[in-house]
């Protein structure tokens, strides 16, 4: 029962998929970050179904670009937008953290979101769907969430409030780190074996960048920064997927 509650907590928080509602408590939040990567499986499966369907080209590309947003409800894009606003302010650390709390969407957030969707759509037009590509992309979507959860359990927090702090505080960090580190390692090996070593490299570079930016600019991570990382990792892995296909590796 606790396992199902843990999965439900992860899906309720990080997706728009209807799930049974439970009161969050110490037990069902302890390993919620371990269930977070399962959302990547759902998104990847929907992406594969879209890619395999006999749809017109533009409809298929639009579906591929929008499926992650529909399933997650845009929670990570919200963090991406807020972080883009904060970084574009060039203010001090306190100013940036204050912008992250502001519910309004600034001009730079709008510009970055438009640029993000344009780039994502363009990259989707370059992907030729095959079963191998589908499996690789499912693994990529799971990997980015495993790395995101690992960061929440490992990186310092920028503040003592917010979503990331809530999950980090409730988590059994030792177990979460071990589970997600092993999962990430297995995924990296599997992706490399499928010819997707460039996707692994892209994800790890973005993770390194995430740590560097969060520490230097904010003094640690927040829920918004976690969303920023996930969206950046997804875009760069998609670019790497296109590069692998162009290079004849897939």
Regions from the language model: what does each represent?
Residues 1-24:
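Membrane-proximal soluble regions of multi-pass membrane proteins
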Residues 46-54, 67, 71, 124-127, ...:
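Alpha-helical membrane-inserting segments
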Residues 9-12, 26-51, 165-169:
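N-terminal beta-alpha supersecondary unit
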Residues 146-180, 217-222:
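Solvent-exposed interhelical
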Residues 18-24, 75, 95, 149-159, ...:
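C-terminal ends of transmembrane helices
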Residues 29-47, 86-132, 136-137, 174-190, ...:
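Multi-pass membrane catalytic core of lipid/isoprenoid biosynthesis enzymes
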Residues 34-84, 135-139, 196-216:
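Membrane-embedded alpha-helical segments that form the functional core of polytopic membrane enzymes
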Residues 67-105, 214-233:
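Acidic (Asp/Glu-rich) catalytic motifs at the cytosolic membrane interface
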């Amino acid at each position: 029962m606790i396992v199902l509650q843990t999965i439900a907590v992860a899906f309720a928080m990080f997706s728009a998929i209807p799930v049974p509602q439970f009161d969050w408590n110490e037990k069902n939040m302890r390993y919620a970050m371990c269930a977070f990567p399962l959302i990547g499986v759902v998104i990847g499966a929907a992406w594969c179904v879209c890619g395999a369907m006999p749809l017109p080209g533009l409809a298929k590309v639009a579906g591929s670009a929008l499926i992650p947003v529909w399933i997650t409800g845009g929670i990570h894009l919200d963090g991406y937008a807020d972080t883009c606003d904060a970084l574009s302010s060039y203010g001090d650390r306190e100013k940036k953290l204050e912008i992250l709390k502001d519910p309004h969407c600034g001009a730079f957030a709008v510009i970055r979101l438009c640029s993000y969707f344009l780039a994502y759509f363009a990259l989707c037009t370059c992907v030729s769907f095959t079963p191998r590509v589908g499996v690789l992309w499912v693994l990529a979507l799971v990997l980015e969430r495993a790395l995101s959860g690992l960061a929440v359990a490992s990186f310092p927090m920028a503040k003592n409030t917010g979503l990331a702090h809530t999950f980090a505080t409730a988590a059994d960090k030792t177990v979460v780190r071990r589970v997600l580190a092993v999962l990430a390692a297995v995924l990296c090996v599997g992706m490399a074996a499928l010819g997707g070593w460039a996707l692994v490299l892209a994800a790890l570079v973005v993770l390194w960048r995430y740590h560097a930016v969060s520490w230097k600019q904010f003094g640690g991570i927040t829920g918004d920064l976690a969303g920023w990382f996930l969206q950046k990792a997804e875009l760069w892995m998609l670019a790497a997927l296109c590069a692998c296909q162009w290079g004849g590796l897939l």
